[in-house]
Amino acid sequence: MVKLVFARHGESEWNKANLFTGWADVDLSEKGTQQAIDAGKLIKEAGIEFDQAYTSVLKRAIKTTNLALEASDQLWVPVEKSWRLNERHYGGLTGKNKAEAAEQFGDEQVHIWRRSYDVLPPNMDRDDEHSAHTDRRYASLDDSVIPDAENLKVTLERALPFWEDKIAPALKDGKNVFVGAHGNSIRALVKHIKQLSDDEIMDVEIPNFPPLVFEFDEKLNVVKEYYLGK
């Protein structure tokens, strides 16, 4: 059976500060760095050997991927980066403290923005310091593709082509795959893999640690799902 390991990035500096992060390129905290290393140690203990790795274009996921591969003695494994694995874009909430946002907009509204499947948060201004429209890493993309805000539905729509074009074919070829990504891009793919309803995915949380493992048969039916070390 082939294995797919999802590792959400370790705690970031903005996770630590309770800020909405989204596409802002925030670094790992000291705790997050250790979580990434510990993820790699769990992978090594489990004897999982990868053939291919994928990650986003955000440093917290890239570093988590590299640290986990290094700690599992697999730093040589090819890594492909894609914006399609980025975190959900939190729009105008980016950089805001979650508690302060609740005070400003109300607990219920912020909860809807965070947890609903298809409600968009406010758009980010194009001149915002965190706007992806002026970020060089997205220069090859058509400007119309770059989001100003996303919900989980939109996140799945842009992550799904990467699943279909890259991850699923690798698994079908018998390759074990590592994906170092983000809470919501992983949630989106888990929704697709498990065929969860829009309501069911609302209750799914992806922790910074430990990694989540799916084992598939040759037709990519899920045979087993578990968290490493649990």
From Swiss-Prot:
Q: Name one Pfam family in it.
A: His_Phos_1
**What pathway or pathways are given for this protein in its record?**
Carbohydrate degradation; glycolysis; pyruvate from D-glyceraldehyde 3-phosphate: step 3/5
| GO-annotated molecular function | phosphoglycerate mutase activity
Name the catalysed reactions. Answer: (2R)-2-phosphoglycerate = (2R)-3-phosphoglycerate
The active site lies at 9, 87
Enzyme Commission no: 5.4.2.11
Record's function text: Catalyzes the interconversion of 2-phosphoglycerate and 3-phosphoglycerate.
HAMAP family with a match to the protein in the record:
PGAM_GpmA
What protein does this entry describe?
A: 2,3-bisphosphoglycerate-dependent phosphoglycerate mutase
The record lists the organism as: Streptococcus sanguinis (strain SK36)
